[in-house]
Every structure is written in structure tokens, then in C-alpha cells.
Curated annotation (Swiss-Prot):
Belongs to the universal ribosomal protein uL5 family. Keywords: Ribonucleoprotein, Ribosomal protein, RNA-binding, rRNA-binding, tRNA-binding. Part of the 50S ribosomal subunit; part of the 5S rRNA/L5/L18/L25 subcomplex. Contacts the 5S rRNA and the P site tRNA. Forms a bridge to the 30S subunit in the 70S ribosome. It comes from the Bacteria. This is one of the proteins that bind and probably mediate the attachment of the 5S RNA into the large ribosomal subunit, where it forms part of the central protuberance. In the 70S ribosome it contacts protein S13 of the 30S subunit (bridge B1b), connecting the 2 subunits; this bridge is implicated in subunit movement. Contacts the P site tRNA; the 5S rRNA and some of its associated proteins might help stabilize positioning of ribosome-bound tRNAs. HAMAP family: Ribosomal_uL5_B. This is Large ribosomal subunit protein uL5. GO terms for molecular function: rRNA binding; structural constituent of ribosome; tRNA binding.
Length: 180
């Protein structure tokens, strides 16, 4: 069964973007390819339990098992050795991607304190959008009482758009709340 956002994309957003951006083929209309959720856990070097807690939270809110990210270089300033676990990330595609994006737009972002919208300047020039979240407790799956420490995360939405303008139009139609 397709998610609500995927049905909206195919039935409503694709025809609107096709007309709005004057494409010659319906296949040129940009689509969301994947969403990458990255959580950096700097204090995982001293206490591995913090990494396990972050991994379980990431698994709850994404619906799949995260990959542990390891340090590429040794840095004495951070007491870090090459190969040490320093974070976790999840790549979402397909139905889970649409479900997560729907949850992010309609449930999580409105729960952020003093939320005025996500930045319009968070595009990378190639049609990808990245935003940061300061607290994981905005997601309903994360139990506030079991949270050891408030952690942030980076959410990257990778699209097939060639320019920032196309990606902005796509995400605006999807319902991403951009700042005024």
C-alpha cells in the first residue's frame, strides 16, 4: 500500500510541477530519491552506551536499523582514533521515505519550539536539501522519559532536481514549511 504523500506526489504534484516548470516530458519532473538521517554522537568515544541509546532512537523514528559511522582519521584534540564509532545514519527509500517525510512535515516540525519554518538557503546547488534538528524528542516514537541526553540530527533530502529552484518547488508542493 502506498503512503499518503506518495499518492499526493503522483496524482497532484507531478502534473503541477510539469506545467509550472515547463518540462517537455513528464519524466523530467524532479522526485525525492532518498532521505539520509545522520546523528553524530561525539561522546560515544568515552561511553559506548550513549551510542547504543542513539542507535535505538534512530531505529524507532526511521523504522530500520541504522549503520554505525566510524572516524576516518585520528584526531588527538577530540581523543579520537581512526575506526572509532562516532555516529549513526539511516538511508530511507521508497515507502519508508515517504512515511518519514510525512511524519516530519506534519508531526515533528510543528512540535519544535519557536518554529518559523526551515531555511530556504539549505540547498546545496544540486537540488538536495539539508536541515538540522536540535532535539530528537519532537518525534512521537521517542519516549521523553527514556532519553538520556537530547541529541540533534541532520536530515538530507536527496532529489533528482538539477537546480535549487526545482528542488524548492518540489519540496514546497510536498508541504515543507519554509520560512517566510
Amino acid at each position: 500500500m502506498k503512503s499518503r504523500l506518495e499518492i499526493k506526489y503522483k496524482d497532484q504534484i507531478v502534473p503541477e510541477l510539469f506545467k509550472e516548470l515547463n518540462y517537455k516530458s513528464i519524466m523530467q519532473v524532479p522526485k525525492i530519491q532518498k532521505i539520509v538521517i545522520n546523528m553524530g554522537i561525539g561522546d560515544a568515544t568515552t561511553d559506548p552506551k550513549k551510542l547504543d541509546a542513539a542507535i535505538s532512537e534512530l531505529e524507532k523514528l526511521s523504522g530500520q536499523k541504522p549503520i554505525v559511522t566510524k572516524a576516518k582519521k585520528s584526531l588527538a584534540v577530540f581523543k579520537l582514533r581512526e575506526g572509532m564509532a562516532i555516529g549513526a545514519k539511516v538511508t530511507l527509500r521508497g515507502k519508508k521515505m515517504y512515511d518519514f517525510l510525512d511524519k516530519l512535515i506534519n508531526v515533528a516540525l510543528p512540535r519544535v519550539r519557536d518554529f518559523r519554518g526551515v531555511s530556504k538557503t539549505s540547498f546545496d546547488g544540486f537540488g538536495n536539501f539539508t536541515t538540522g534538528i536540535k532535539e530528537q524528542i519532537i518525534f512521537p516514537e521517542v519516549d521523553y522519559d527514556k532519553v538520556i541526553r537530547l541529541r540533534g540530527m541532520d536530515i538530507t533530502i536527496v532529489t533528482s532536481a538539477k537546480t535549487n529552484k526545482e528542488a524548492f518547488a518540489l519540496l514546497q508542493k510536498v508541504g515543507m514549511p519554509f520560512e517566510k
